[in-house]
């Protein structure tokens, strides 16, 4: 397996404050690596180092096959970066912004205009291309900002809180665009304050807390690792609730909780085999259920277990 991003032991200090304390990250080529962490955990510092905007005090990294320290200029030619807030010039039009970036990347005038037109069409902005950015909605600005970050066809793209402040519809549009990029072989490192975003997009997730990676894996792995599954059963008849409660308590060894209005009975379980046992017991008792399932912990619950902080406390990445 080839890796577009590999970092080992990254350390960064700001005076007496250690922002990163031995961070290891790895992103296979063409994948999305989600980086989660509470405010001040070190997410943005990590991105700035991997984008050559900061030099680490210790550790090493390669990006797109180039050494971050010895080949920084080559790395810059292979990456794109989108920060938390749109960085395009509000006085220029969409076309002018993209052409300007193309020219800065040493494209010819003709090639820069062709690339701008291509990206405006791809991101659904062709009709707005001749308008000043200050007339764009927040979602349109973010889409243009994302387009701007790939003018140079980067191999690696850093997205630092790319959907901050967007409404759900605009956020979903950005998600679709990001997924499309990985289909072309682009590797994405995504920091986000939205756990749903990481759950939806990331192939693997690294959780950073106090400058250290405290967990890494697929979303479902993190969920299983950090909490029990929840057994959920809703009897078809309200009269069966007491008997189902008794059966669930006997199987799990704990008193289940019950939603009195909907009749949903829930209990934490360690062994998923209990679900099969419950099905047999209900069948023996002649009880039918409208709902019967095992639910993994949410990524929010996993995040709380790993960092001691709920996702709601997250804010601007640091």
Model-derived regions: residue spans:
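ABC transporter nucleotide-binding domains
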Residues: 3-7, 12-209, 214-215
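Structured loop/turn residues at secondary-structure junctions
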Residues: 66, 128, 138, 236, ...
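ABC-family P-loop ATPase nucleotide-binding domain
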Residues: 1-11, 309-318
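Generic beta-strand hydrophobic packing signal
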Residues: 8-10, 254-257, 290-292
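ABC transporter nucleotide-binding domain
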Residues: 175-269
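Preference for bulky hydrophobic residues occupying beta-strand positions
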Residues: 12, 25, 233-235, 267, ...
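C-terminal coupling/interaction segments
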Residues: 270-318
């Amino acid at each position: 397996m080839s890796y577009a991003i590999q970092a080992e032991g990254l350390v960064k200090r700001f005076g007496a404050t250690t922002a990163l304390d031995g961070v290891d990250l790895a992103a296979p080529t063409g994948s999305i690596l989600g980086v989660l962490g509470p405010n001040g955990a070190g997410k943005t510092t990590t991105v700035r180092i991997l984008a050559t905007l900061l030099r680490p005090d210790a550790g090493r990294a390669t990006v797109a096959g180039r050494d971050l320290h010895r080949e920084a200029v080559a790395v810059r030619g292979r990456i794109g970066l989108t920060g938390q807030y749109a960085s395009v010039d509000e006085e220029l039009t969409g076309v002018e912004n993209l052409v300007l970036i193309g020219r800065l990347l040493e494209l010819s005038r003709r090639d820069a205009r062709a690339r701008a037109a291509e990206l405006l069409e791809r991101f659904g902005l062709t009709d707005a291309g001749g308008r000043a950015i200050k007339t764009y909605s927040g979602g349109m600005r973010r889409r243009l900002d994302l387009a701007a970050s790939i003018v140079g066809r980067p191999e690696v793209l850093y997205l630092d809180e790319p959907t901050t402040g967007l409404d759900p519809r605009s956020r979903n549009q950005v998600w679709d665009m990001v997924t499309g990029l990985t289909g072309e072989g682009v590797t994405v490192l995504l920091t986000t304050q939205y756990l749903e975003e990481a759950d939806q997009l990331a192939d693997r997730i690294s959780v950073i807390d106090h400058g250290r990676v405290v967990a890494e894996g697929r979303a479902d792995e993190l969920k299983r690792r950090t909490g029990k599954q929840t057994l959920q059963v809703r009897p078809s008849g309200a009269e069966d609730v007491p008997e189902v409660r008794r059966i669930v308590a006997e199987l799990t060894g704990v008193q289940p909780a019950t939603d009195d209005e909907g009749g949903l009975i829930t209990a934490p379980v360690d062994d998923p085999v209990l679900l099969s046992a419950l099905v047999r017991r209900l069948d023996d008792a002649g009880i039918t259920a409208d709902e019967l399932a095992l639910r993994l912990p949410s990524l929010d619950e996993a995040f709380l277990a790993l960092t001691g902080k709920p996702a709601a406390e997250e804010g601007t990445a640091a």
